Amino acid sequence: MLPRGYSKCGPWLCGLLGALSIAGPCVADASAVGSTNVTVADPTVPRPPGTPCVVTLFSGDSFVDFSDHPYSYAPPGGCGTHWAKVVLEADFSVTAGRQFDRTAQLWLGGVNLYYGTTQEPSSTVSPSWHVERDLTDYSALLRQAGTGRAVLGNVVNGTYTGVIHGSARLLFYPASLRAPGALTPDSVLPLGSDAVGNATLLDTSDSPLSKTLTLPTNIDRAYLDVIAQSQSSDEFWYTCVPDSYAAEVQECGGGNFREAEVSIDGQPAGVAPVYPWIYTGGIDPYLWRPTPGVQTLNFMPYRVDLTPFAGLLSDGNPHTVAVNVAGANHYFLASATLLLYQDPHLRRVRGGLLRNTLAGQAPTPTIGDTLATDTDGNVSGAITTRLSRHYVIAGYAITSHGRVDSTVDQTVAFTDTQSFTIDASTYRQVTDQLTSVDGVSRHRIGRHLVAEYHERLRYPLHVDYSFDPTSDGGYVMATQVHQGYTNDIRREFAGRTLYAAHVSNTVDAGDTLDFDGSFNVTGHNGQQNAQSFAFRDSLGGCYRTDVASTDGVVTDEATGVGCPDGQNHVYWFTRPDGSPVSGSALLGW
């Protein structure tokens, strides 16, 4: 029997689900209340029934410098080559002391397997944390032996003493009657130039991550997984202002619009929104102890649908696929992986592009302001940045199913308001930013609409920052942050909804830092942090976990609130963590 809350499905889907098991109630381990260690509300990757084969990538490595950490990989024996699910598990820790947050990446054959950052330690807390990623869609890569590396640069000396340790493994769940083999891409190809793998530095808007490829000639669907991480001068891009305002409001220049642009042979092919990740040393390190910001430890790639280009990419000629970050201002690191589904019954798919209204729509935002400076030099008002683009990209491919017409219809919008109050006793800046994506991918065979994939994505960010003098000659810096991530997806087949899901992840954090007259930190107060992660789907799956902390100690943890029987409960083949899915109407398992 399906769980309560199940919504109506078609006969084919209901029949399939009747033969599948569900992941048992996701009950949390021992309560984290009272802990100072890393505590997050994020779900782990749900698992199918069966015993996995485990392949260790590396174990107990110490990261003390920027040296290479290579590893060799071979597919597991005893689990076949067509798996129900593949999961990456990684564990990290850093010794107590002083250390910056660091970027962590795992690679295999040039393909990124994991991307995130590390938790900063304190003088008394040695944090440890666990991350997981669903790599089932990368099964084609994992069927071949290869070489990979862990990239986690660190500095350990008399000042920065924190040593980072890490281990990682892959778990392969064999296909069975209860857990059928997943329908996965036939080719998994990196865009980076490093054959083993590393992120590509994009210094300006014109810096590309690109590769020229001669691809299989029978592509019927294509996607690109994109991660774009801000670094250096761009770390706090979400608070920056256009250059012409930077001196007046005492902020970083370069503007605050960032967006990844995907192109094929120089022609715009899609857009990947950039998430405003805040690292654990960001703004005020106490904000993120013990709960970091949204996805800080485990970035989720954004999947761009390139299926309208399938016919063009199958023509046997070399094609250049590229990613640029619009607005990059020294600098972003980027990773991109091309996923190709191939027609098993044809050696050659023919087709072409029919329409592309993204071409000619440059990613150039509109800037406005209400700033005013009075006779005393006090500044007040706001700077606004706006961009919204609606586009349609359509193409066709002659496949073994007949002619398939594919359309991506998408609106991508960015709004940002930077509000300032600056006078002799106050510097206050309030950031309100929202990145949104509303899109649908459609596939038709003849006159029949056979598949639709809808997505509604939101990245809200609010930062309220003030820096004020105190009566004793010192200063206080008060910060409040709200980060959010919501994603609603819906798959339809022949006009009927097969599956729908909602993911929500929010973090709210606040703290006040105290400084002496020489700007040395002398203490902090009022630290609070709360994270809420929720997932629901049309099959009755439900996940909800909330954690809260005060002064760096977990004060509350609740699981299953609002779920049937007060228990977290999801199907093993779903993706409650918000990891990307391919927009196939026949579901991705």
Language-model region placement:
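Extended extracellular/luminal ectodomain segments enriched in beta-structured repeat modules
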Residues: 78-87, 215-223, 234
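Bacterial N-terminal signal peptides that target proteins for export
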Residues: 2-14
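Short, contiguous, pocket-lining structural segments
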Residues: 205, 216, 254
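Bacterial N-terminal signal peptides
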Residues: 12-24
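A short secondary-structure junction signal
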Residues: 203, 207-209, 232-240
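Compositionally biased low-complexity segments at domain edges in trafficked proteins
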Residues: 182-206, 213, 346-414
